[in-house]
Amino acid sequence: MNQTNFGFKKVDYTKKQGLVNSVFSNVADKYDLMNDLMSFGLHRLWKDEFSRQIPNLNSHILDVASGSGDIALKLAKKARDRGNNIALTLSDINEEMLKNAKKKAIDLNLFQNLKFTVASAEELPFSDNSFDYYTIAFGIRNVPDINKALKEAYRVLKPMGKFICLEFSKVKESYFKDFYKFYSFSIIPTIGQAITGNKEAYEYLVESIELFPSQDEFRIMLKEAGFEEVSYKNLSGGIVAIHSAYKI
C-alpha cells in the first residue's frame, strides 16, 4: 500500500486528499479569521511581500490552492488600480473554499478577468505552456504528492514563466525555535478549538508544517522538477519562506 503523511499519521495515499478536503471544508467559514489570529496579522504582510514578486501584472497568472482567494484578489486589485490587463485563474480542489473566494471577488467588485476552477494541483486541467506565473500560498504542503504537483507547475508554465510559492518553513534561530514549537503545538490548536470547534484541523495544520521540507530541501525538489534559477527568501526568521524558480 502506498502511504503518505496526513500530519503525523500515516494514511493511504488515495485517502489523503479527501482528509485534507474535510479539514478545509470544516473551517472554511472561519478560515480568514483564524489566519489573522494565529499569525497576529503577519500573514497579511507575508502575502504583500509575496505579491511583490510579480512586477508585471499584464500577465496570465494561475493561483493554485487559491483557498479564499487572498493572493489572487490582492493581485487583481493591484492590477485594476494600475490599469493593467491581468488574467487570473483561481484553482482549488476544495469547492467550499473557492466559493468563499468567489464571494469575496464579487463583494470587492474584482470579478472581471477572473476564472475559477475546481482542480487538483497534481492534475491541472490546463494546456502546456499556458501561464506566465504560477503562484501557490500555504498550499503545497497539503498536496499528497508534492513532486507531482511541482512537475505540473512546470508543465503549465510558459518558457521563462515564474513559479512562486509562499509556505511555512524552518525557523533558524535556536532561541526562537522552542517558543515557536510550543506556540504551534499548544496554542494554535486551542485557538482553533475556541473559534471553529475543530481542534483536530489545527493539529493537522501544525503537524503538516513540522513535516514540510526545509528551505534547502524544497529548493532541491524544485530543481528535480526541472526548474532553474531556484532561490528562497526567509520572512520572520524563517517562519515562512518565499520560493522562486523559473522554467527556462
Curated annotation (Swiss-Prot):
Keywords: Menaquinone biosynthesis, Methyltransferase, S-adenosyl-L-methionine, Transferase, Ubiquinone biosynthesis
Catalytically driven reaction(s): a 2-demethylmenaquinol + S-adenosyl-L-methionine = a menaquinol + S-adenosyl-L-homocysteine + H(+); a 2-methoxy-6-(all-trans-polyprenyl)benzene-1,4-diol + S-adenosyl-L-methionine = a 5-methoxy-2-methyl-3-(all-trans-polyprenyl)benzene-1,4-diol + S-adenosyl-L-homocysteine + H(+)
Enzyme class: transferase
EC numbers, comma separated: 2.1.1.163, 2.1.1.201
Pathway: Quinol/quinone metabolism; menaquinone biosynthesis; menaquinol from 1,4-dihydroxy-2-naphthoate: step 2/2; Cofactor biosynthesis; ubiquinone biosynthesis
One example of a Gene Ontology biological process annotation: aerobic respiration
Binding site for S-adenosyl-L-methionine: S68, D92
GO molecular function: 2-methoxy-6-polyprenyl-1,4-benzoquinol methyltransferase activity; demethylmenaquinone methyltransferase activity
Keyword Transferase among record annotations: yes
Pfam families given in the database record: Ubie_methyltran (PF01209)
UniProt cross-references to NCBIfam families, sorted A to Z: MenG_MenH_UbiE, PRK00216.1-3, PRK00216.1-5
Function: Methyltransferase required for the conversion of demethylmenaquinol (DMKH2) to menaquinol (MKH2) and the conversion of 2-polyprenyl-6-methoxy-1,4-benzoquinol (DDMQH2) to 2-polyprenyl-3-methyl-6-methoxy-1,4-benzoquinol (DMQH2).
Family indicated by similarity: Belongs to the class I-like SAM-binding methyltransferase superfamily. MenG/UbiE family.
Listed name of the protein: Ubiquinone/menaquinone biosynthesis C-methyltransferase UbiE
Organism, scientific name: Rickettsia felis (strain ATCC VR-1525 / URRWXCal2)
Gene from which this protein is expressed: ubiE
